[in-house]
């Protein structure tokens, strides 16, 4: 955090926390009115742990976890809010952190989607408030 410019830290918080809150404000009224729907908020392994050099990102994803857990308690029966740790995916961010060769051992975004979509389509109100991860995708 000492080396991170304030505007970079602010941008991470603005996107990952404030952006999420703004999207929720748009969709929740209609969902609550019908008492139906599942909200899946993308978190991260770093939303459930910490690591040096990524304190702003960790802080933002811990906020996603907390916001989602609180929202789950506020929703009416028939709805759910879950925080999803998508697992380790071969993305540009991962390549920057791990290097291209080590990152290549993890699924691409396309491979992830093929595994995640069937899982996510089964998320229901019984999962409300539970932190989730995609089965078969490494999370650490």
List each model region and its residues.
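Substrate-binding pocket helix/loop in short-chain dehydrogenase/reductase
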Residues: 1, 5-10
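Residue(s) in the substrate-gating loop at a strand-loop-helix junction
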Residues: 44
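Active-site loop-to-helix junction immediately N-terminal to the catalytic Tyr of the SDR YXXXK motif
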Residues: 4, 50-58, 70
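A short helix-coil junction within the Rossmann-fold of NAD(P)-dependent oxidoreductases
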Residues: 26-35
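C-terminal helical subdomain
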Residues: 77-79, 83-84, 91, 100-140
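Active-site helix of classical SDR
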Residues: 24, 60
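Active-site-adjacent segment of SDR/Rossmann-fold oxidoreductases
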Residues: 49, 70-79
